Amino acid sequence: RNGTLLTSESGNRYEVVSLLGAGGQGEVYDVQCNGRHYALKWYFKGSATARQKNILETIIAKGSPDASFLWPMELIVPAQGDLYGYIMPLRPKNYKSIVDLMKKRVNPSFYTLCRTAFNLTRGYQKLHAMGAKYQDISFGNLFFNPDNGDVLICDNDNVSFDNSKPGGVLGTP
């Protein structure tokens, strides 16, 4: 709920500002801490498993491969209940989804498209170079700045650093 106060495992206090959206695993909220806005992914009951929490703890400990990933930063685990979530950077509003491109809601230059492709490839290469794999590639998880081709890759809570099977999602078939 808007106005709800949550404390992270590291002691930071976040206030829920508004619901941004929902997916198969949970809801994403705009939250605020010390005057800065972040995104909070809050898991639904069926997705808030011990396995998913272990995956998140590993991802947070390893750190982001680079700034193109909206990487989990810290966990929010209330003292009561089985549900939890994590904090990540908030995507700037000027970034558009690949779906926006496919539906022609944005019309970047050919140069920007090439830079977007290069930056996506470079981001995944950096992820793989640190021994990880991204397990949720879908059109809704890739964003780009239509002015310069910078990219943001979200939904990184299913990244794996071992040979485990995918978590709760399988990406785009």
Q: What residues fall within each predicted segment?
A:
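Conserved alphaE helix
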Residues: 110-129
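Catalytic-loop of the protein kinase fold
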Residues: 124, 128-146
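Conserved hydrophobic "DFG−1" position in protein kinase catalytic cores
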Residues: 30, 90, 144-145
